[in-house]
């Protein structure tokens, strides 16, 4: 059981390690999409997410002018993301 737990923990750490910092800045705009995804524009690039738990947090960050860092394994504009870092600067 312990070996299986460690293997899962290592796999999760490996996946998170692959997520690069794609864009850092204030959210320029956000919108809901017809396919139930949510798009934000940061640092001149648009990224979408299907994680509903991130949407109210991203909207709050936009309204308060908080800086965010979008993290993804693909950093091309128009790509998806599942991780965001909220910064206090």
From Swiss-Prot:
Keywords: Disulfide bond, Modulation of host virulence by virus, Secreted, Signal, Toxin, Viral exotoxin, Virulence. GO terms for cellular component: extracellular region. Residues 1-19 form the signal peptide. GO terms for molecular function: toxin activity. The keyword Secreted applies. InterPro entries: Enterotoxin, SLT_beta. Disulfide bonds join 22-75. GO terms for biological process: symbiont-mediated hemolysis of host erythrocyte; symbiont-mediated modulation of host virulence. It comes from the Viruses. Changing residue 51 to C: Complete loss of cytotoxicity. Transmembrane segments: none annotated. It is found in: Secreted. The keyword Secreted applies. Belongs to the stxB family. The B subunit is responsible for the binding of the holotoxin to specific receptors on the target cell surface, such as globotriaosylceramide (Gb3) in human intestinal microvilli. Shiga-like toxin contains a single subunit A and five copies of subunit B. There are three Gb3-binding sites in each subunit B monomer, allowing for a tighter binding to the target cell. Binding sites 1 and 2 have higher binding affinities than site 3. This is Shiga-like toxin 2 subunit B. It comes from Escherichia phage 933W (Bacteriophage 933W).
């Amino acid at each position: 059981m312990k070996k299986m737990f460690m293997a899962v923990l290592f796999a999760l750490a490996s996946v998170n390690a692959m997520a690069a910092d794609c864009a850092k800045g204030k959210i320029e705009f956000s919108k809901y999409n017809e396919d139930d995804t949510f798009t934000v524009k940061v640092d001149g690039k648009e990224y979408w997410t299907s994680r509903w738990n991130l949407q109210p947090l991203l909207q709050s960050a936009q309204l308060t002018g908080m800086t965010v860092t979008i993290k993804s394994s693909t950093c091309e504009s128009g790509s998806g993301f599942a991780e965001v870092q909220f910064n206090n600067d």
